[in-house]
């Protein structure tokens, strides 16, 4: 199964989700993208530090969401605005959900961009729990 996590710039939330999910779902292809990413831009320093401290894979450069990405098995966005944009731009989007929606949780994953390391750590911990729920849903 190919899963794509999507956020705004692909420098904070979706790279964290990608790394966490790769560690929890090693038999699946997991990548991340940004709706407004600048291809090749480095991920945020706080994201990189948090992932390295936990010995997780670090996706070092941002990648934008492209037309070929719509062919993934599952597309999980960090917020409803990302989901809405994908659904407006592409056909056949029954496999596009917010991450929270897909695992039956209320809310969205907040953007820590520009915040302190502790703000990023909060998002990491939230994503870790959401991806535990994702793993349970996929494997059961």
UniProtKB/Swiss-Prot annotation:
Q: Which UniProt keywords apply?
A: Hydrolase, Protein phosphatase
Reaction catalysis annotation: O-phospho-L-tyrosyl-[protein] + H2O = L-tyrosyl-[protein] + phosphate
Q: Note the CDD domains from the entry.
A: LMWPAP (cd16344)
Sorted alphabetically, which Pfam families does this protein's record hold?
Answer: LMWPc
Residues forming the catalytic site:
7 (nucleophile), 13, 111 (proton donor)
Give yes or no: UniProt keyword Metal-binding.
Answer: no
Q: Which InterPro entries match?
A: LMW_PTPase (IPR050438), Ptyr_pPase (IPR023485), Ptyr_pPase_sf (IPR036196), Tyr_phospatase_low_mol_wt (IPR017867)
The catalytic activity of this protein is classed by the Enzyme Commission as 3.1.3.48
Q: Name one GO molecular function term.
A: protein tyrosine phosphatase activity
This protein's record includes keyword Acyltransferase: no
Q: What exactly does this protein do?
A: Dephosphorylates the phosphotyrosine-containing proteins.
Q: Which family does it belong to?
A: Belongs to the low molecular weight phosphotyrosine protein phosphatase family.
**What protein name does the entry list?**
Low molecular weight protein-tyrosine-phosphatase PtpB
């Amino acid at each position: 199964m190919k899963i794509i996590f999507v956020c705004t710039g692909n420098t904070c939330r979706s790279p964290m989700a990608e790394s966490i999910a790769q560690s929890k779902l090693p038999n699946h292809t997991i990548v991340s993208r940004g709706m407004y990413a600048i291809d090749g831009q480095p991920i945020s320093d706080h994201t990189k530090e948090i992932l390295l401290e936990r010995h997780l894979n670090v996706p070092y450069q941002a990648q934008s969401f492209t037309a070929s990405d719509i062919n993934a098995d599952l597309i999980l966005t960090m917020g409803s605005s990302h989901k809405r944009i994908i659904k407006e731009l592409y056909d056949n989007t029954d496999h596009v959900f917010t991450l929270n929606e897909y695992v039956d949780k209320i809310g969205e994953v907040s953007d820590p961009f520009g915040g302190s390391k502790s703000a990023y750590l909060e998002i990491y911990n939230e994503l870790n729990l959401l991806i535990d729920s994702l793993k349970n849903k996929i494997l059961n």
